[in-house]
A protein has these predicted regions:
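Alpha/beta enzyme core
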Residues: 3, 9, 13, 22-45, ...
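Active-site flanking residues adjacent to catalytic metal/cofactor-binding acidic residues
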Residues: 16
Length: 160
């Protein structure tokens, strides 16, 4: 499912966003919630991705559950800050194998862990990661930005 196909229709598009469950108890609740929400026939579900890839397996498992078990159209996030090109490629290869066609690309927040060290080839900007992905994959890509300028930007002019 490519999200862009939905927005050409003359009706509201409804999506629901999920954070990957953090433990078995949350996973059990997640299943019940997804089943109830699926009855509302959302157009697609999105699944977030932890800072610095901190919960990337949880994100993958959640997307896998939505796509393979629940048969729900899903969009996977990828937050590339801290990840190297090989790690991003692995994540995207896994999503491609699941049949995911739309990826939501964000730089992502810096992890709160003061000992966190980003990969030396980490992407500092989502726009750089989008170029990397477009050169290698046929995903439909979405992204988010800061119209007022990013908090870490030197100036709005340089940010734009």
């Amino acid at each position: 499912m490519r999200v862009t196909e939905l927005y050409g229709k003359k009706r509201p598009v409804v999506s629901m966003e999920f954070f990957p469950p953090r433990d078995d108890s949350a996973a059990a609740k997640f299943d019940g919630i997804v089943d109830k929400l699926a009855d509302r026939t959302p157009d697609y579900m999105t699944v977030t991705f932890g800072a610095g890839g901190s919960n990337r397996d949880g994100s993958y498992q959640t997307v896998k559950k939505l796509v393979k078990e629940k048969e729900l159209p899903s969009v996977a996030y990828i937050a590339g800050y801290g990840l190297g090109p090989d790690e991003i490629t692995t994540v995207l290869d896994n999503y491609k194998e699941l049949g995911v066609e739309t990826i939501f690309v964000i730089r992502g927040d810096k992890p709160r862990d003061e000992n966190f060290a980003p990969h030396p080839e980490s992407f500092d900007y989502a726009s750089d990661m989008i170029g990397f992905i477009k050169d290698r994959y046929d995903f439909t890509l979405g992204c988010a930005g800061y119209p007022e300028g990013h908090l870490e930007a030197e100036s709005l002019d340089k940010d734009i």
